[in-house]
Amino acid sequence: MENLIGYVAAFLTTVSFLPQVLRVVMTKQTRDISRNMYIMFFLGVVLWFVYGILRSDLPIILANVVTLFFVTIILYYKLTEGNQT
Protein backbone atom coordinates (compact mmCIF):
# COMPACT_ATOMS: atom_id res chain seq x y z
CA MET A 1 0.00 0.00 0.00
CA GLU A 2 2.79 2.45 0.81
CA ASN A 3 4.36 1.86 -2.61
CA LEU A 4 1.02 2.63 -4.25
CA ILE A 5 0.83 5.91 -2.33
CA GLY A 6 4.39 6.67 -3.41
CA TYR A 7 3.64 5.99 -7.06
CA VAL A 8 0.45 8.08 -7.04
CA ALA A 9 2.19 10.99 -5.29
CA ALA A 10 5.15 10.75 -7.67
CA PHE A 11 2.85 10.67 -10.69
CA LEU A 12 0.78 13.67 -9.59
CA THR A 13 3.69 15.91 -8.63
CA THR A 14 5.60 15.02 -11.78
CA VAL A 15 2.68 15.46 -14.18
CA SER A 16 1.94 18.85 -12.63
CA PHE A 17 4.90 20.21 -14.63
CA LEU A 18 3.51 19.08 -17.97
CA PRO A 19 1.27 22.13 -18.62
CA GLN A 20 4.21 24.49 -18.00
CA VAL A 21 6.50 22.47 -20.26
CA LEU A 22 3.92 22.41 -23.04
CA ARG A 23 3.32 26.15 -22.75
CA VAL A 24 7.06 26.94 -22.87
CA VAL A 25 7.66 24.63 -25.83
CA MET A 26 4.67 26.01 -27.76
CA THR A 27 5.23 29.71 -27.03
CA LYS A 28 9.03 29.68 -26.63
CA GLN A 29 8.54 32.32 -23.92
CA THR A 30 9.85 32.09 -20.36
CA ARG A 31 9.89 35.76 -19.40
CA ASP A 32 7.61 35.24 -16.39
CA ILE A 33 9.48 32.18 -15.12
CA SER A 34 12.12 32.64 -12.43
CA ARG A 35 15.50 31.40 -13.61
CA ASN A 36 16.89 31.17 -10.09
CA MET A 37 13.91 29.20 -8.84
CA TYR A 38 14.26 26.65 -11.63
CA ILE A 39 18.02 26.33 -11.09
CA MET A 40 17.47 25.66 -7.38
CA PHE A 41 14.61 23.31 -8.16
CA PHE A 42 16.77 21.45 -10.70
CA LEU A 43 19.50 20.96 -8.09
CA GLY A 44 16.94 19.76 -5.55
CA VAL A 45 15.51 17.24 -8.01
CA VAL A 46 19.01 15.94 -8.78
CA LEU A 47 19.51 15.37 -5.05
CA TRP A 48 16.12 13.64 -4.75
CA PHE A 49 17.12 11.40 -7.66
CA VAL A 50 20.43 10.50 -5.98
CA TYR A 51 18.59 9.89 -2.71
CA GLY A 52 16.18 7.56 -4.50
CA ILE A 53 19.07 5.63 -6.00
CA LEU A 54 20.82 5.34 -2.63
CA ARG A 55 17.60 4.02 -1.06
CA SER A 56 16.67 1.90 -4.09
CA ASP A 57 13.29 3.63 -4.00
CA LEU A 58 11.72 3.22 -7.43
CA PRO A 59 8.89 5.79 -7.03
CA ILE A 60 11.41 8.48 -6.06
CA ILE A 61 13.78 7.50 -8.87
CA LEU A 62 11.11 7.43 -11.59
CA ALA A 63 9.40 10.63 -10.52
CA ASN A 64 12.63 12.56 -10.41
CA VAL A 65 13.93 11.24 -13.74
CA VAL A 66 10.79 12.52 -15.45
CA THR A 67 10.81 15.76 -13.44
CA LEU A 68 14.47 16.33 -14.37
CA PHE A 69 13.52 15.93 -18.01
CA PHE A 70 10.70 18.49 -17.70
CA VAL A 71 12.75 20.97 -15.67
CA THR A 72 15.68 20.64 -18.07
CA ILE A 73 13.41 21.58 -20.98
CA ILE A 74 12.14 24.67 -19.16
CA LEU A 75 15.64 25.68 -18.04
CA TYR A 76 17.01 25.20 -21.55
CA TYR A 77 14.42 27.59 -22.95
CA LYS A 78 14.94 30.01 -20.07
CA LEU A 79 18.73 30.07 -20.39
CA THR A 80 18.73 30.32 -24.20
CA GLU A 81 15.96 32.90 -24.48
CA GLY A 82 18.31 35.81 -24.05
CA ASN A 83 18.24 38.49 -21.39
CA GLN A 84 14.58 38.14 -20.49
CA THR A 85 14.08 37.55 -16.77
UniProtKB/Swiss-Prot annotation:
<dbReference type="GO" id="GO:0005886">
    <property type="term" value="C:plasma membrane"/>
</dbReference>
<keyword id="KW-0812">Transmembrane</keyword>
<keyword id="KW-0813">Transport</keyword>
<dbReference type="InterPro" id="IPR006603">
    <property type="entry name" value="PQ-loop_rpt"/>
</dbReference>
<protein>
    <recommendedName>
        <fullName>Sugar transporter SemiSWEET</fullName>
    </recommendedName>
</protein>
<dbReference type="InterPro" id="IPR047662">
    <property type="entry name" value="SemiSWEET"/>
</dbReference>
<feature type="transmembrane region" description="Helical; Name=3">
    <location>
        <begin position="57"/>
        <end position="77"/>
    </location>
</feature>
<feature type="transmembrane region" description="Helical; Name=2">
    <location>
        <begin position="33"/>
        <end position="53"/>
    </location>
</feature>
<comment type="subunit">
    <text>Homodimer.</text>
</comment>
<dbReference type="GO" id="GO:0055056">
    <property type="term" value="F:D-glucose transmembrane transporter activity"/>
</dbReference>
<feature type="domain" description="PQ-loop">
    <location>
        <begin position="2"/>
        <end position="59"/>
    </location>
</feature>
<keyword id="KW-0762">Sugar transport</keyword>
<dbReference type="GO" id="GO:1904659">
    <property type="term" value="P:D-glucose transmembrane transport"/>
</dbReference>
<dbReference type="GO" id="GO:0042803">
    <property type="term" value="F:protein homodimerization activity"/>
</dbReference>
<feature type="transmembrane region" description="Helical; Name=1">
    <location>
        <begin position="5"/>
        <end position="25"/>
    </location>
</feature>
<keyword id="KW-1133">Transmembrane helix</keyword>
<keyword id="KW-1003">Cell membrane</keyword>
<dbReference type="GO" id="GO:0016020">
    <property type="term" value="C:membrane"/>
</dbReference>
<comment type="function">
    <text>The homodimer mediates transmembrane sugar transport down a concentration gradient. Transport is probably effected by rocking-type movements, where a cargo-binding cavity opens first on one and then on the other side of the membrane.</text>
</comment>
<dbReference type="Pfam" id="PF04193">
    <property type="entry name" value="PQ-loop"/>
</dbReference>
<keyword id="KW-0472">Membrane</keyword>
